[in-house]
């Protein structure tokens, strides 16, 4: 694969794996190459184990053409449960695992539960920081910025959407073409017939509705990978949002928060939106990305198997974890009494082996 010898390909991929993908069908013992998918796409997993120090939000699938030019695939992501970089393609050629360091680095996301998801959204140009070095992960996401992120993910041409119907969306605002696009496409309707409230924070049930509309209008069929959950605050979800919340939860794109609450009227934070964008990309490529280890929208870990939250003891890769018998949330960082015996769990949730306690 001479193309991989280019300076650009070496800089993007380094020593990470590369694959020359092809598709064939077998008939009568004879292999026939399939060169054209006729406008359809196929989901691909590139197996990969991140190197020490690599942040998974910065991992991409990259396409290398015959001249050695690299295309970074925005709609690709590393999924830890699948242990692979996932993406969709409509053609077969040379692909590899690339790494793009986001510069400048955000100084306010270190240790944040959504740090990798924030890097995913920022490195792909879906979300910007609130300054050159800050992301403000726990502040609210405005409606204008949210729709802008969706437009960027869809890859629209802003020049094609310079006029719109909302009187409170100024033509020179950065979000104007994206709001116009979303309205013309039927993804958003506005808070009234003529206003959008672009600078107002979006709440979680509004986010669910817009995401469901986005998927439908762009032709994505949302899977029902996870078992439906009845949230503790289900009665607080507006009637017009209930179906969207259920669809997003079952697909694995939106999750609850602590105490099994959805918090429908709560403001969607910038960290939550970054997380939703990453989940969406992974889920529409490979619905099974919703199984395995998953964080809820407060950053707590659960483990899903065949669409259901595992509860009690979990053995995974020769390590033991304790998942609450009611909520399924992983216990981490300290002593825990289980069935009359004491166990110690590290900060990553793994049980300390050979633990002896005289409590």
Regions found by a protein language model. Give the residues of each.
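Extracellular adhesion/carbohydrate-binding repeat motifs centered on closely spaced tryptophans
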Residues: 78, 82, 285-359
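Generic recognition of long tandem-repeat/solenoid scaffolds
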Residues: 21, 31-35, 82-90, 135, ...
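Proteolytic processing hotspots in large secreted/extracellular or virion-associated proteins
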Residues: 1-67
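Short, surface-exposed beta-strand/turn "edge" patches of beta-sheet domains
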Residues: 67-91, 261-262, 333
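Short, ordered beta-strand-loop transition motifs
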Residues: 11-17, 26-28, 76-84, 130-131, ...
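Feature responds to low-complexity, polar/acidic, surface-exposed segments characteristic
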Residues: 90-115, 123, 128-144, 151-177, ...
